[in-house]
């Protein structure tokens, strides 16, 4: 019943009939579970994307998007950054789906609509004459973070870059180059600088390999064991290995190898560590879709499982994890989080919290735009329905299996 309720309530924007019209209760149970589940994921995508993309495409994002922060006194400062946060983070989560081929007709209609809105959004975000022109490095250090999410989105969806005319492409390059004057601190931020340079590699634009090389070398030094990196020299109990470190590090390496094969041994080693960390993340998902509320930036909600979603999307899950159980685990997380009231305001914008509206959970750097990192869980929508991730029947994930009395193999460190 919860799944049915979510499907009926989530698609509210009148874009694609199949996604916005509730299916008759008498027939919904006859539909293969994977098809129904994909619709649930698409409705979550639609809830996140619709207000951001439509407002930005109309050059009205700064006018329409509220700026919520932990405390009212922080709003003026966070307003300098929040719009690029919203766009960059949303884009990097939905990019594989925008790139995807072989989608069904009704899904393809929504995909085509959002692709066009994203193109117009990129134009406005990078055009200095537009009202929604964003802060790419003119003020503060935060733009480095979200310019990198934006660049990561273009890496994940090359069709977006290819669809831009030459003037807009140059605007994008100019915007991203502004971030080079921002000196990243000695932590995961090094990877933000590296990702932007990796994007330049993919478009055959002059790049600074030193930024890539330094980020990789430092993270090699910060590895703590059993698939976990320090966020800098120190270990922190949070989800930054998933939010940023593992996905960024591997994808930067994959691109860097095309220019210097000396990175290949590190790429292979990083993949082994990434596989292990995906096992850990899957085991953190409780039988009811809950997960430990620990560490900073917890209000990124479902973004805590960026890495697990990315490994599923890249089809690099460990052999011990069937794609179906990962799909079911991630679906349980989505359902649990979206079941809460007050996750969105009356106009469809995200509100601070994990389960509903909980502004005290935020750090001082969190604002409305920050929250759209939650879209990272949606990466597997880039896989076709015929992929094992979507095409196989439901399977319990580790926590659910254990609590049903199943006899699992013992978990081992790397």
What does each model-identified segment do?
Residues 61-67, 73-106:
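N-terminal domain-start signal
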Residues 235-350, 362-385:
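Long, repeat-rich segments with strong aromatic
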Residues 54-71, 75, 126-131, 333-414:
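CBM-like carbohydrate-recognition segments
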Residues 1, 20-42:
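C-terminal segment of N-terminal export signals and the immediately downstream linker at the start
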């Amino acid at each position: 019943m919860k799944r049915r309720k979510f499907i009926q309530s989530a698609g509210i924007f009148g874009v694609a009939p199949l996604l916005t019209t509730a299916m008759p209760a008498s027939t919904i149970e006859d539909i293969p579970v994977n098809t129904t589940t994909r619709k649930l994921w698409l409705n979550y995508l639609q809830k996140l994307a619709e207000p951001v993309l439509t407002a930005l495409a109309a050059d009205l994002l700064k006018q329409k998007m509220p700026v919520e922060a932990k405390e009212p006194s922080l709003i003026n400062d966070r307003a300098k950054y929040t719009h690029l946060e919203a766009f960059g983070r949303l884009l990097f989560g939905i990019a594989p789906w925008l790139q995807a081929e072989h989608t069904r007709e009704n899904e393809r209609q929504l995909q085509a609509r959002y692709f066009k809105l994203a193109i117009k959004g990129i134009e406005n975000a990078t055009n200095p004459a537009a009202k929604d022109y964003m802060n790419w490095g003119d003020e503060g250090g935060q733009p480095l973070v979200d310019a990198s999410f934006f660049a990561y989105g273009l890496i994940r969806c090359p069709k977006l870059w290819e669809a831009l005319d030459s003037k807009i492409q140059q605007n994008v390059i100019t915007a991203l180059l502004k971030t080079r004057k921002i000196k990243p601190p000695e932590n995961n931020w090094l990877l933000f600088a590296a990702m932007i340079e990796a994007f330049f590699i993919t478009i055959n634009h002059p790049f600074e390999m030193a930024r890539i090389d330094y980020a990789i070398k430092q993270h090699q030094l910060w590895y703590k064991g059993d698939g976990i990196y320090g966020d800098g020299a120190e270990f922190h109990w949070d989800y930054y290995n998933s939010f940023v470190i593992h996905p960024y590090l591997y994808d930067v390496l994959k691109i860097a190898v095309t220019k210097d094969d000396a990175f290949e041994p590190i790429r292979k080693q990083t993949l082994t560590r990434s596989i292990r960390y995906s096992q850990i993340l899957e085991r953190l998902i409780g039988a009811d879709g809950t997960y430990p509320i620990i560490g900073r930036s917890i209000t990124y909600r479902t973004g805590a499982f960026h890495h697990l979603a990315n490994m599923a999307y890249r089809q690099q899950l460990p052999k011990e994890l069937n794609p179906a159980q990962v799909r079911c685990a991630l679906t349980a997380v989505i359902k649990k989080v979206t079941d809460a009231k007050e996750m969105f305001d009356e106009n469809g914008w995200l509100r601070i919290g994990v389960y509903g509206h909980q502004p005290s959970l935020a750090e001082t750097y969190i604002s409305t735009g920050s929250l759209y990192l939650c879209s990272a869980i949606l990466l597997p929508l880039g896989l076709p329905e015929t992929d094992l991730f979507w095409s196989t029947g439901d399977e319990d994930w580790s926590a659910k299996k254990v609590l049903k009395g199943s006899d699992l193999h013992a978990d081992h460190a790397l």
